[in-house]
Structures are given as structure tokens and as C-alpha cells.
Amino acid sequence: MSGTVTMHSVFVYGSLMADDVVRLLLNRIPQTASATLPDFHRFSIKGRVYPAIIPAKSDKVSGKVLFGITDDELNVLDEFEDVEYERENVQVLLTDSSDEKLQTKTYVWAKKDDPDLYGTWDFEEWKQLHMEGFLKMTKEFAEELNLPKSEI
């Protein structure tokens, strides 16, 4: 008798928009779709290379949704995001399908009034300046969790 498998969708807006990072963590690239999260802002964080989002009226965050995430994969993402983020249910707009609304999960910065949040984090800048080092850190993280090895 087989149990039901719950599949999740997760809106990502920072380092997890990079397929290479996701592959190291999940050992695969899930199906994705471009999406926008309304009423949030993506901040840079002093001393960090990854971003944080917190609620912000009349703002929006561009990212993508990862589909078909298993419970085990969601647990890996929870570990990766650590205690600085809280997993929350949000509604995003899928930008590839005439702004269809989708309920999904995302990781919101836990400390809403953090003085270390500033400006706007830029994915393209991160890819150029920090992705290589971030991939090394992610690979070490995956090895610590004894995740299956990904061929990058």
C-alpha cells in the first residue's frame, strides 16, 4: 500500500533562482515558472551575499516558482534557509500565464525590523560577483547533510 506524496511549490527570489544552486541541494532541476510576489521588497543584507524579503505595500519581488517539491526536498530547503527565514504561504502571480494567481510557499526574513536590511538585492550582480563562492558553500552544505551528489 503506497502513501500519498505531497508536492509543494516554492517561490524563490534569491540564490535559489540559480539552477546550479538548486541542483546541488535537490540533485535535480524542478519545473519552474516566472512569478511576481506582490507587496514584498527584496533587500540586500549587510555582510551577506543573499537577499531577504519582507512585506512592503505597493512593492513587488520578481522570482520563480519551483514546482513538484517533495516533503524531503522542502526539508532540505528549510535547512538551507535556516532560522533567519520563516516559511510562509503566499500568493504569487505567474507572469508567463497572464498573471494567474498561485498559492505557494516562500521564505520571509524573520526579523522584520532588521537594521541590516538595505537597498534592493540584484540577482544579475550576485551571479557575477558571488555565485562561484556561493556554489562552493552550497556544495559543502549539501555534503554536511549527506545529500546525494550532484554533477556540477
Swiss-Prot record:
Induction: Down-regulated by biological and chemical stimuli. SUPFAM superfamilies: Gamma-glutamyl cyclotransferase-like. Belongs to the gamma-glutamylcyclotransferase family. Expressed mainly in leaves. The keyword Acetylation does not apply. The gene is AIG2LD. Substrate binds at Y13, G14, S15, L16, M17, A18. Keywords: Acyltransferase, Transferase. This is AIG2-like protein D. Signal peptide: none annotated.
